[in-house]
Amino acid sequence: MVLRNAWTVIIYVILCSRSLADCVVDHVHLSGSWGSAKFTVEVADTDAERARGLMNRASLAKFASMLFVYDGPQQVGFWMKNTSIPLDILYFTAEGILLDIRDNTIPGDLTVLRSSGPVQYVLEINAGLAETLNLGEDTILNHARLVQGKKTLACR
């Protein structure tokens, strides 16, 4: 009986360690009924970083991304000014649930692409990846950033 309990504890620790290892600052994971994907990520969490975003960059590696983090849920808008990379823009709630996708944005376009409701995270990825991965409304954002003292759903 003691041996069985010891193995249970060991397996639990391994599973928890693996789960926590997936929630790191330099990577973001998306998951849903479609499967999952891992991206390297740059975090933009100050006004200056969010304003600059991916402007004036010539390229973005296939599974690279930028995560915009806001202090609290709010309606946000993005444009493609000085951005030469076509992007998919993914808007996530404070709980890390996908709310909107603005796909295949046009480089240099000044049209403001607003979220349909309050969001706390926005993830920019290369254009076409949202469709290729078949991202849907059940997509969850996994990242180490805290939300009101709690981790996003998949990082708990």
Describe each PLM feature range.
Residues D22-R156:
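Compact, glycine-rich, soluble single-domain proteins
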Residues N5-R18:
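Bacterial N-terminal signal peptides
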